[in-house]
A protein has these predicted regions:
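A short, histidine- and acid-enriched strand-loop-helix "catalytic/donor-clamping" loop
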Residues: 1-14, 30
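Short hydrophobic faces within alpha-helices
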Residues: 168-169
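Short, polar loop motifs at secondary-structure junctions
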Residues: 36-39, 109-116, 179-183
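Conserved catalytic-core segment of nucleotide-activated headgroup transferases in glycan assembly
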Residues: 64, 72-137
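Acidic donor-binding loop of glycosyltransferase active sites
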Residues: 142-159, 174-175
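Short acidic/histidine- and often glycine-rich active-site loop of Leloir-type glycosyltransferases
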Residues: 180-192
Length: 192
């Protein structure tokens, strides 16, 4: 994911990066892409290796990420959820938004924001990552149930980002606002 993202400005690094990617593409039998944008980019740039490239749509376990609980949109305080740890999330944006919209509660689950910084009073920062045990999937499912909206602000890149959070949230009946990037995994499947 993100291997073909061309964000290197240094000409020497760019030269060696391009050689590495060409060699990588040459030696492997199959290259699987989770982002349709990156898949199309790689197909165009390395068209001689097109037969090795496959787009695999990202999915989620809809049996687990499911709820019958109805959202209470009439509640006086509404909860906005942000989850993520990869380098393409826009952490500055979510913190700025939380400080500007004080009448919403923000639950931010990440290890990328230090808990020693001054946070707005409406922010509940939870340290969590998919591969640690700080927050179980069952706990996360409850947080999705309690949230009125999931925000996934992203920095522009060919690297796909936010698929699991978006699909889990939608499966739980929680609407999602996500940045459309060059690496958006299946842009034709999402509207507005």
């Amino acid at each position: 994911m993100g291997l073909y993202n061309q964000s290197v400005n240094n000409p020497i690094k760019k030269f060696f990066r391009n050689k590495f990617i060409y060699f990588f593409t040459l030696i492997f039998d199959k290259l699987i892409f989770l982002s349709h944008g990156e898949y199309e980019f790689a197909e165009q740039k390395y068209f001689n290796f097109k037969n090795k490239m496959y787009f695999l749509p990202f999915s989620t376990d809809v049996d687990f990420w499911n709820t019958n609980k109805k959202k209470n949109y009439e509640s006086p305080r509404k909860q906005i959820l942000f989850i993520g740890n990869d380098g393409k999330r826009d952490y500055d944006f979510i913190l700025k938004l939380a400080s500007e919209i004080q009448d919403y509660d923000f639950v931010i689950i990440t290890k990328k924001i230090e808990n020693n910084i001054k946070l707005p009073k409406n922010v509940n920062l939870l340290s969590g990552k998919w591969d640690d045990l700080n927050i179980s999937d069952k706990d996360l499912r409850t947080i999705y149930e309690e949230s009125h909206l999931t925000l996934i602000p992203l920095l522009d890149s060919l690297q796909p980002s936010g698929q699991s959070v978006a699909l889990q949230s939608l499966s739980m009946g929680t609407p999602v606002i996500i940045t459309r990037t060059k690496g958006f995994w299946e842009p034709d499947k999402f509207v507005n």
